[in-house]
């Protein structure tokens, strides 16, 4: 398919668009043809003039030509800013350490690390025996594996317990479909037998011959089957272990801390179930730990003969329970507490470490098994991100954790849990960065229903002028996923030009379970009004200047962008909407589209009439109005499996037809990428440079867009 797409991208117009001179084309955007397609649901007929832009095979000449015309138009509109884009790219590149390596860690007799080398996009993974000062042995060189491909991502690297065999999962298209390959570590050649159509989730059993993996449905791409593979055999001989029949659930795999169990996770947005396979008897059937119950989530681990389970079966928030065996009652160890979300835990011989979120910020607590004495890791910044890092060996009194803030580069620490002595192992090196030049803050703004919404922000001290700075507000607000306020070296290119950068921790994500519930399904509108209110609050507090306000979000955050430009178009000068989920009604009505069925608990199921009208009330594609809109840059990937390319393409086509005024509306489709954009550490910088240069060009329209006056 890639060769066909390349040819289509190179050909001239197929007659869908009128030819224009170069000067005229700068001012006239592609106009997509209209082919009315009526979708009637609950007696409501929606006419979609751009439904034809959907091509599941991604080969339609008309579709490819339209996307190519949009790409050309975007390039022409932004070409005057190419020197600015290059300047920003060079800044981003210069801040990136060219030769770098991770903090090594010990596991099963070996020390592991990854590293990157100057001029190369991908990581190299290596190991050597513990306490050895000898040469590192290369396990996988991502640069070699990526040769000849436009896109490359390694999803998993798994080594057999006897340290002899390597399995890796790789995606070469950007659709999260992984191929698993094998190699004996002491041999250079990769084996011919591969496993296709997998989720990238792979786990070895303890016999060193059995590998469990997850199959994806070929149409919906849902991970739905657990399969057992015998090393050295053909995939056609593999045995089905478990198949999930309910397409609102996803299947995943993990191995317990004890290494005694393969954990089969069957999860939806708000319900989970786990099945266990004896890792020492991988031919045995899986046993259910606790049958699923709607609205109940639990997440188990196993260590020292007991199960440790994070669950909300007794309370809307999570507690931690200890279970002696599958049939034993669950004994509460950490009771659920209002206002505290237990988000994760790590098991050690002498310690339990828990990761909890309170008021949107993460706390890390250490608890002694022997004395039950507790200690909490202290953090200095007013707003920050912290997490339990990689601790693969439990027989230690040392905890490794990560920390970052909007003014503190990503850092890896170790803390002695006996003495509480901390050691900084590594901090991201950023050329010419001085933390003292920047200020981070956390403020609370009042939403229209009276709820207080936190906002994390950062700016350069010497460039901050009350009420005079350009302001960029970022948001997501879905799946309960927190956009924690971490450091970004790329962001410095905005801060050093006087921008205030803010993250609005809106309902739907960020502050824990209750905050999530208040921003999903029947409460989804809160997500959008929170973002608008957060922006207004920032302006009223002097963190930005009206007419110089910008917004950015991607995926579900792209939905957020689509909703807020419909609801408050005059609040923002420019918007960047990356891989936006904007045709919510049509997508959620089609169970054949990847991710649809698994997200009914997030958005609702429009086959239900109440859900239908509620979703339609905010779906960006269905609420475009004949009004002035801000300048908008939309990006997508042709091979995106999470938000199909045709959603942003249709949205742009319809916006261009209906909106008033001459604001810029640009669509860029990466013909070789998926949901995550370009692969490789340097290639990804190009996307950031384009987004930032677009915003900076709008800050200087007289120079870059004089025709927009």
Which positions does each model-derived feature cover?
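Positively charged n-region of N-terminal signal peptides that target proteins for export
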Residues: 1-7
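Beta-propeller folds
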Residues: 7-13, 17-398, 402-410, 414-419, ...
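Glycine-rich His-Gly loop
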Residues: 116, 312, 404, 474-480, ...
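Active-site-proximal cap/loop segments of hydrolase catalytic domains
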Residues: 505-709
């Amino acid at each position: 398919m890639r060769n066909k797409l390349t040819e289509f991208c190179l050909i001239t117009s197929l007659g869908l668009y009128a030819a224009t001179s170069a000067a005229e084309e700068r001012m006239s955007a592609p106009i997509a043809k209209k082919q009315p397609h009526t979708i009637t649901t609950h007696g409501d007929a929606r006419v979609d003039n751009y439904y034809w832009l959907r091509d599941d095979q991604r080969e339609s000449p008309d579709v490819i030509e339209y996307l190519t015309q949009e790409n050309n138009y975007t390039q022409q509109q932004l070409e005057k800013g190419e020197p600015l884009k290059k300047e920003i790219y060079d800044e981003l590149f210069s801040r990136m350490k060219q030769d770098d390596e991770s903090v090594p860690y010990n596991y099963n007799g070996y020390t592991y690390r990854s590293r990157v080398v100057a001029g190369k996009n991908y990581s190299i993974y290596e190991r050597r025996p513990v306490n050895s000062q000898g040469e590192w042995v290369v396990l996988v060189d991502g640069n070699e594996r990526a040769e000849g491909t436009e896109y490359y991502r390694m999803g998993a690297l798994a080594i057999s317990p006897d340290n002899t065999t390597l399995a890796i999962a790789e995606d070469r298209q950007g659709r999260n479909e992984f191929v698993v390959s094998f190699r004996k570590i002491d041999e250079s050649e990769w084996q011919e037998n591969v496993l296709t159509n997998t989720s990238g989730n792979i786990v070895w059993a303890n016999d060193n011959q059995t590998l469990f993996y997850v199959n994806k449905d070929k149409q919906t791409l849902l991970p739905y089957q657990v399969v057992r593979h015998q090393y050295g055999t053909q995939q056609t001989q593999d045995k089905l272990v478990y198949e999930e029949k309910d397409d609102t659930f996803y299947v995943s795999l993990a191995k317990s801390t004890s290494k005694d169990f393969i954990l089969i996770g069957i999860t939806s947005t708000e319900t989970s179930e786990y099945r266990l396979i004896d890792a020492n008897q991988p031919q045995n059937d899986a046993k259910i730990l606790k049958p699923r119950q709607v609205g109940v989530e639990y997440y188990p681990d196993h260590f020292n003969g007991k199960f440790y389970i994070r669950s909300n079966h007794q309370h809307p928030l999570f507690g931690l329970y200890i279970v002696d065996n599958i049939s034993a009652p669950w004994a509460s160890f950490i009771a659920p507490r209002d206002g505290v979300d237990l988000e994760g835990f790590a098991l050690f011989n002498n310690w339990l470490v828990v990761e909890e979120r309170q008021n949107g910020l993460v706390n890390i607590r250490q608890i002694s098994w022997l004395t039950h004495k507790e200690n909490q890791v202290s953090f200095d910044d007013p707003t920050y991100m912290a997490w339990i890092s990689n601790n693969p060996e439990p027989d230690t009194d040392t905890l490794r954790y990560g920390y970052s803030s909007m003014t503190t580069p990503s850092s890896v620490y170790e803390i002695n849990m006996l003495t509480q002595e901390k050691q900084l192992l590594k901090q991201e090196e950023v050329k010419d960065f001085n933390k003292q030049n920047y200020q981070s803050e956390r403020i609370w703004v009042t939403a229209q229903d009276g709820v207080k919404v936190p906002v994390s922000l950062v700016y350069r001290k010497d460039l901050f002028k009350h009420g005079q700075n350009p302001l960029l507000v970022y948001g997501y607000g879905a799946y309960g996923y927190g956009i924690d306020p971490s450091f970004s070296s790329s962001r410095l290119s905005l801060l050093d030009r006087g921008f205030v950068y803010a993250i609005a921790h809106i309902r739907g994500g960020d502050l824990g379970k209750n905050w999530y519930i208040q921003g999903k399904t029947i409460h989804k509108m809160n997500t959008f009004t929170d973002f608008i209110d957060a922006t207004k609050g920032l302006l009223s507090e002097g963190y930005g200047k009206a007419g110089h306000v910008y917004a950015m979000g991607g995926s579900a955050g792209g939905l957020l962008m689509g909703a807020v430009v419909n609801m408050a178009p005059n609040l923002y000068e420019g918007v960047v909407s990356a891989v936006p989920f904007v045709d919510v009604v049509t997508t959620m009505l089609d169970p054949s589209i990847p991710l649809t069925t698994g997200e009914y608990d997030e958005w609702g199921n429009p086959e239900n009439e109440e859900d239908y009208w509620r979703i339609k009330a905010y779906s960006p594609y269905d609420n475009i109005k004949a009004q002035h809109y801000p300048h908008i840059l939309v990006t997508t990937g042709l091979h995106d499996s999470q938000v199909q390319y045709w959603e942003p393409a249709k949205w742009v086509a319809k916006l261009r037809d209906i909106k008033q005024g001459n604001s810029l509306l640009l669509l860029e489709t990466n013909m070789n990428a998926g949901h995550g954009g370009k692969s490789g550490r340097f290639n990804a910088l190009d996307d950031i440079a384009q987004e930032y240069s677009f915003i900076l060009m709008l800050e200087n329209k007289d120079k870059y867009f004089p025709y927009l006056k």
